[in-house]
């Protein structure tokens, strides 16, 4: 008899749900925008667009009487400054865990530490984190980059992580850097919800014939979960919409 298991941790995390609720609460207002997609979920962004909430990528795109909601991934200090100069109403939906990283990076870099961010340099969360550093900042996401990383041995090094980075990969890259004998301070800033999801996904995949990972193609969270599940279960499928589910179902091998 076939059994369908739904992960207990499935669904939006606290930070994402908070951001989405924040935007929906602003729906119906005049000139409401999000700075970048509020979350990496195309279906949600489309629904908000239909409700009159538009996405911008620059303060130059709006007028002074606008309401701008900061995306869950956060933005750089320069973006905040540009919005304040426009005299707009700013609603900050940045995930609190991301805001914590901004504070860490700002304080550590102000004290002279070199900043190493473990994450995807092209991800908006990482771009935002970089924008709070006042010192030399480096981004790595592979063993090769960690091996080739050369830092000033006379200065402290502060290591933080993108909140959705693979936890096991984070530990691997930290170990490589620590072997270089720098004065390193490691702050595991991977969100607890990310660790819980990744751990549960791995365990469920190990005992399943088929895994279906549902989420947006641009979501770092979903991409990492897919990679983890695929390593444990060859029949792992990445689904964004119900239409894709119907197509993938024909390929399921139980």
PLM regions with names:
Residues 208:
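An anion/phosphate-binding loop that grips the pyrophosphate of nucleotide cofactors and donors
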Residues 2-134, 138-150, 167, 172-178, ...:
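Active-site loop-to-helix "anion-binding N-cap" substructures in soluble metabolic enzymes
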Residues 187-193:
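Long, charged amphipathic helices and adjacent flexible linkers at domain junctions
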Residues 216-248:
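A C-terminal functional module that forms or caps the active site or interfaces directly
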Residues 250-254:
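Conserved small/polar residues in nucleotide/adenosyl-binding loops
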Residues 156, 160-167:
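Conserved anion/nucleotide-ligand pocket segment
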